[in-house]
Amino acid sequence: MVKSVNEEGAETAYAYDENGNGYGGGNNDVATAIALGQRATQYGMKVCIDFHYSDFWADPKKQFVPKAWQGMNIEEKADALYNYTLDSLTQILEAGVNVGMVQIGNEINNGMSGETDVANVRKLLTAGSKAVRKAAADSGKDILVAVHYTNIDDMKKLDTLLTGLQVKEIDYDIVGLSFYPYWHGTMDDLKNAIIHIRDTYDKKVYVAENAYCYTAEDGDGTSNSVEGTGDLAEGYSASVQGQANEVRDVCAAANEAGAEGIFYWEGTWIPVGPADADNSAIWEKYGSGWA
């Protein structure tokens, strides 16, 4: 997979790292991140490390505190986050992974690692940023610090969050935006969001996540994220060609707006059917459908 996308022009691979004991749905620990990162580095690619700071992958609806950090106050949690980030990133760098960027949190519009108070989230971001800067300095590498948001359809809230980072002088380099047209708007909305953030906050921007379905059929006996024609983005069918058109248009829109690039997420997360009784029982435990 890595070799194939590199041959087609991909420059950066996206490896995410969940800490602690997972709930299923795939567990990307440090060892896995190293293995994937080494594979990408082998083909001349840079790697983006995405810290979710959770035992389960994080998004606006799920920002669970790791079980190992439960009961900590914000100062203790910030220290734990700093140490975890520094230790993990140091291991990854020492393993020879060509890290070009680190996301400190994943889709943090509504909170991060169990914290919903914006002041506490900023403390965690500061701790994560300091850890990345330390690891970068120790390794002699130039590594971008990224903050990752989604829901560009609510730019008012996104502006509030980014203004808070600016006022409190949070140290970061680049803003990542998730963009799925069936949830977040049109290509013009994406372009406008990128241009607005670049001009208003003087930060680089990239599309941290994008994907589109090539079929609306159920492949694993559980519900799909996007189901039926009513859920699809206008102008893009649930087909191989529709998927290709959407990805090309997102790339074009991002480039036109001055974005640094785009990550397709998640290109290998496909059903492995059939959805029989034996497989379904395993998927229910490990999350190979509902996650």
Language-model features: locations:
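Active-site cleft segment of glycoside hydrolase catalytic domains centered on the general acid/base Glu
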Residues: V30-A31, D59-Q166, I170-Y172, G185-I194, ...
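Short, glycine/acidic-rich beta->alpha junctions
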Residues: N28-T32, D189, G242-E246
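Short acidic/His/Gly/Ser-rich catalytic and metal-binding motifs that mark active-site loops
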Residues: G9, D55-F64, N110-S113, Y214-G221, ...
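Aromatic-rich peripheral "rim/lid" segments of glycoside hydrolase catalytic domains that contact
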Residues: N192, H196, T215-G228, L232, ...
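N-terminal substrate-binding region of glycoside hydrolase catalytic domains
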Residues: M1-Q42, K46, H52-A80, G176, ...
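Glycoside hydrolase catalytic-domain groove-lining segments
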Residues: K134-L144, D159-D231, R248-E260
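Active-site beta-loop-alpha junctions enriched in small/polar residues
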Residues: V5, H52-F56, I104-N109, H148-D153, ...
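Hydrophobic faces of well-ordered beta-strands that scaffold small-molecule active sites
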Residues: M1-K3, V47-F51, G100-I104, V145-V147, ...
